[in-house]
Amino acid sequence: VNILEAARQNSINRISHASSMAAHSFLPGSDSLKTLYGAYKMCDEQISEVYWQDHKVPSMCLRPAIVNGVGRDQGMTSKQTVAMLAAAFGEPYDIPYTGNVSHLSAAEVASAFIHSVSYDGDGAFVFDIFGESININETIKMINKIKPNSKITSSGSEMPFPSKLSDT
């Protein structure tokens, strides 16, 4: 809200902000989201829509899936990157989830944000950025290919988010 209000007060003609694939994590047969984080991100998206409706503050919201790479060391979805770092240092690491997950590089997501802020649009737009859906066991195989005999494992439940959606 603070960024949108600052944009309104200072006649800024476009902003770009991040949501998350967690905004898609609805409980089966329900309008309720599975996670507080997903509800928070969905709320941000709706606030942007209202700022466009009431104040004509345009915005571009991107919903990246799991981002891997430099700078990803916080939060549940950073654990693949943490595993890569552990392998590089020869340390064991257990990725605390299983199943299929989307893979995006930090560089491609950064590029999407840079391009999104350069777009002049009339509205509050939301776009998904999902990348390739890969089973976490395949990720571990890729890590082992680069760093043989790494001690990377995975356990736990699947992530409560979709692993693949269209990038639209």
What are the language-model segments listed below?
Residues 37, 41, 101:
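Catalytic tyrosine of NAD(P)H-dependent dehydrogenase/reductases that use a Tyr as the general acid/base
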Residues 3, 40-48:
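Conserved catalytic Lys-bearing alpha helix of Rossmann-like short-chain dehydrogenase/reductases
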Residues 16-20, 63-65, 130:
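Active-site beta-alpha turn of Rossmann-fold NAD(P)-dependent dehydrogenases/reductases
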Residues 7-10, 52, 116-117:
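Hydrophobic pocket-lining residues that define ligand/cofactor binding sites across diverse proteins
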Residues 2-38:
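Conserved Rossmann-fold NAD(P)-dependent oxidoreductase catalytic core, especially the SDR/UDP-sugar
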Residues 23-24, 67-69, 109, 134:
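Conserved sequence/active-site signature of Rossmann-fold short-chain dehydrogenase/reductase
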Residues 49-101, 108:
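NAD(P)-dependent short-chain dehydrogenase/reductase
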Residues 96-99, 103-168:
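C-terminal substrate-binding subdomain of Rossmann-fold SDR/epimerase-dehydratase oxidoreductases
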